[in-house]
Amino acid sequence: MPGQRGELLARRENGQGLHHLVWRLGPGWRVCSSAVLGGGIGPRAWILNAQVPGGYPRLDPDRHLAEIATAEGLGGPGAGLMTAADVTAYTTAHDGGVTATVTSGLGVRGWAAAPAEGTGGPLAPGTVNIVVTLPVALSDAALVNAVATATEAKVQALLDAGLDCSGTPTDAVCVAAPDPGTDAGEPFAGPRSLWGARLARAVHRAVLTGAVDSGERDATAGAALRGSVPQA
């Protein structure tokens, strides 16, 4: 399905080169997501995953994403995600018609159930963003189930990559599927259902590849930084 593949695009903001991924779904799609723009469940014509600089200064990320969408000619309702990770290093995996695309940046990671209380204030842009597209319609419950399944697969992949964490504080998940119309749609998307299992495997492979690649990039950057420090 054409809408299942994201398109990598470039832009400049304040003199800095940045990238974003766009899924031009068109009519007849529903999305369930934790996106900062257009989150929740409903019809969505597009999905945007935009890179922003580290130390993101703006306090209106939803408006910022809407501006990027407008510049790309994206009309109608959509879902917008944000990340400080290198979007050009995105990873993709496929399984039985399900496509998972992930942008990974794991510099600020930890466990969901941390002992300290949350800050309650705005957080830095999410660093593990997952976009999943399916070729079959899902019921409302199955869409929510699919987001949970994707999250479980993400944590499994991070552990398999040797990371002691469940993710980063601002990870986001976005699941897109055709509108069921008068049909109820697939009722289940848990990890032991047909489509949930395919989703889980695709997400696991994409996150695992992204986590390993991210670790290698961090190690290379760290070595370069150490090499630039004058030795006593």
Language-model regions: role of each:
Residues M1-A232:
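Alpha/propeptide regions of enzymes that mature by internal proteolysis
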